[in-house]
Each structure stands twice: as C-alpha cells, then as structure tokens.
C-alpha cells in the first residue's frame, strides 16, 4: 500500500522480524541445552536444536560453542534409549535419530577439516583435543567400537566411515615428525 501511494517501504519491519527469528533460534537452542543438562530429555532437545538450526544455521556452524556436537550427542543418546523421553521411540525413530546424529557429526567433522586446511597452526591443538574427545565420548557408545556390530550393515558402514575419517583428521592434525624439533644430544 505504501508503495502504491508513492512512499518508500520501510525496511524496519523486516529487520525486526529477522532479529526476532534469530532470537527465537537462540532461545530454542538454549532450551535444547536445558533439556539435556537438567531434564535428560534428549528427544525433545533434538527437536529444539533442529528447529533452531533451521531458523539460524549459524548456530549449528559455530564450532566453538559445540552446539551441533551437543545436538548430535542428544540424538545418539535418544536413539540408544537413554533419557526421560526415549521409551516411547520405536525402531524407525531411533534409526532416524542415529542418522541425525551422524549428519550433525559429519558436518562438524567437515568444518574442523576445513579449519585445519585454512589455519593449520592455529587449529591443530583444538582439533586434536576435539577428535580425542569424540573418540572417547560415552554418548556415542552405541554407534562406536564393538557396538557397531549391532547396527544394520548400511548404517554400520556409515558410522565406521565417520570414525575412520575422524581418525584420519586427527592424524593429519598431529604434529609431523619433520616439524618437531630434534632432540639435542647430551655430552
């Protein structure tokens, strides 16, 4: 209507709506965090994280906040039957949650690899620490190590590929012998 009257449209409503969407996304992610930390409601957390990431993809892409990683932990835990709200999940829903966990971990792994390519000296230590944590995190016990044998073959292969790629990135980030100072001989 304003344009029809020859007046320029204000961009303020669009900016306010975008700011509200970002705030809603942040709030949704924070609620997901609360579901995990205080309520052990992992399935609910996954839904909150999914909606928050869809509304503001930057929330998922921030490696330092570990939000996408924590969302993957929630999905893996719910898929394993852990948490207050996991009892109602059927096999199909558990498989979907495992796939969601895999997708989120794969996205983070790709982002860490890109960071290593762009800033190897700066990222190396964080990557080594993070990849070691992933390998040891009990949240993924049902999709790692010997537990992989319990998964359907196609799913098992995808998870094994993730763990293999994770180890490859960890090794790539590890200090190379030619970069390490040579020990001095003592007389």
Predicted regions: what they are:
Residues 1-187:
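Alpha-helical protein-protein interaction modules
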